[in-house]
Amino acid sequence: MKNGLKWALAALARRLLNIGHRKVYHMKLIIAYIQPERLNAVKQALYEREVYKMSVSNALGCGQQKGYLHQYRGAIEEVTLLKKIRLAIAVNDDYVEKTVEGIVAGARTGDIGDGKIFVLPMDDCIRIRTGERGPEAIG
């Protein structure tokens, strides 16, 4: 029993000592919502800054634009959710500013509804094919 207790305590101590020793990566997830017609300009601006990898999806949203009235078959309806494009770009810390600058350069018209950019911390990234983790997985 004594050896069993020692073994259990040693296992618990090993587990506790490993807490907080997870590798810390310096990466960010940049999420941007832009006008659909500005997508090509944003992609071009990002390519010029050597940012080539991104996920693009359709989104609906509202903000200061507030929407508009639309008439369809004689009925007037208020459209409050407007079409947007959502970009998700995972970058290493040294690419954050150039990525944000590229999005702003391509998306800005000066009008309400140009969009928003969110920069979020990202704990990890795993390339499924190779198992690479962290900055190496982003590429």
Roles of regions detected by a PLM:
Residues 2-139:
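Positively charged, small/polar-rich N-terminal and surface patches that mediate targeting and assembly
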